[in-house]
């Protein structure tokens, strides 16, 4: 059974993620972000999920140190704050983008997002008369006030949403395919296809 270690960044969504991983058939172990990196590695995770949470990534316990130790070695899935940590680790800028809390919005897939197996068949704007033309709108649940507009080196944007500072990246992956980040919340009921997206992220990461 795939063992997912979930890093708890003190967020109310953490146990929604635990439930989502359990429903998908994964074993899930939770560690607070203050737990030493060596303790986390000793749990022998197949994949590490960096959870949502408040504030900025640099203030989230040992999360940045964990990324330093594991990126490229153990598959990483970052959600909301966890995604922002991956952005900052690669030198990207995470900044206030206007609060968006508890709303379903349409993420617009980039060309890379259209081609990604994570979002295959999930777009809602495919025209019945032209099914050969891929859709780009995927409904997702947004709960955030920070975001990134420009993907740093090593990060490829998969989808964006509009914000006060421009189109913020809502889904991304590292160019080596070893990490995926989601600014939105796949574990939220506001993400209609969230469970599918979450499972596909795990599948893609484990396949690389």
From Swiss-Prot:
Gene Ontology CC terms, in alphabetical order: cytosol
Domain Glutamine amidotransferase type-1: 3-208
Binding-site list for L-glutamine: 53-55, 84, 145-146
EC number: 4.1.3.27
GO-annotated molecular function: anthranilate phosphoribosyltransferase activity; anthranilate synthase activity
Pathway assignment: Amino-acid biosynthesis; L-tryptophan biosynthesis; L-tryptophan from chorismate: step 1/5
Keywords: Amino-acid biosynthesis, Aromatic amino acid biosynthesis, Glutamine amidotransferase, Lyase, Tryptophan biosynthesis
CDD domains, alphabetized: GATase1_Anthranilate_Synthase
A biological process from GO: L-tryptophan biosynthetic process
Superkingdom assignment: Bacteria
Catalytic activity from the UniProt record: chorismate + L-glutamine = anthranilate + pyruvate + L-glutamate + H(+)
Residue numbers annotated as active site: 80, 185, 187
Assembly notes: Heterotetramer consisting of two non-identical subunits: a beta subunit (TrpG) and a large alpha subunit (TrpE).
Role summary: Part of a heterotetrameric complex that catalyzes the two-step biosynthesis of anthranilate, an intermediate in the biosynthesis of L-tryptophan. In the first step, the glutamine-binding beta subunit (TrpG) of anthranilate synthase (AS) provides the glutamine amidotransferase activity which generates ammonia as a substrate that, along with chorismate, is used in the second step, catalyzed by the large alpha subunit of AS (TrpE) to produce anthranilate. In the absence of TrpG, TrpE can synthesize anthranilate directly from chorismate and high concentrations of ammonia.
Protein name: Anthranilate synthase component 2
